[in-house]
Amino acid sequence: MNEKLPKHVSYSSYNTWLECGWKYYLTKLEDVQEGHAVWFTGGSAVHKATELWDKHGGEAETVWNDAWFQQVKEDEELNGDMNTWQFAKREDMSWWYGEGIWMLERWIKFRQGGWNIYENFIEKEYEIPVGDTTVRLAIDRVMTDFDGNRVLVDIKTGASSQRHPLQLAVYAWALQAQGISVDKAGFWDARTGTISTWNIEHLNPDRIEEMFTTFDKARKTDIFLPNFNNCGRCGVLSYCKWMNGQHTKEMGKVNG
């Protein structure tokens, strides 16, 4: 087994491996960094703002400014000048700053519509052992709705709609391991202020554990297949031997 292999796995790393095995190899084992994007900063700031409001309340504009400027400061320290960050279409830093406060206000309206935090469950992190590895994850919220149902909620800020509830099923599995059951699970869309709930009964704990143990076995036996369908949006393309990236030679034996 490669000594550089991360000791833990996550839903995100599993997704990266499915997206492109070689991208997983470059980013997780060779520490090739993807270029920072504005939507990472914007999404993180919205998450931070909802967390601050849920814990302390306050005026939306004040809460948003605190979250936004703190996130920008942290990300510039790590990723350089914001003017060098990628952005999608018109959604640049100005767009995210202006739209972010609306996203927070939609969350506040959602909360005031009868949705309450279940037992202070806000941004909880877990490490769940499975097979020969550990699954690391962070869960946004567990809430109760206006009918008293206990609901797992994941906050989404991106433009793409969710196509599958696997992420919710993984989080529900982690909650069950902590002795917490939920009646429903859904994605809350910060762009619309609405929640969509999904049926995750077919993705039972055995299926989730099988998925992660199989993923772990594959990565430990160096199964890192490239996926050429996703090259157009790859952040490490310039380091990829399969596409003759401009930095390929710098990788030495990795891309040999």
Where are these regions (language model features)?
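Short, flexible loop/turn motifs enriched in small residues
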Residues: S10, L18-E19, T134-A138
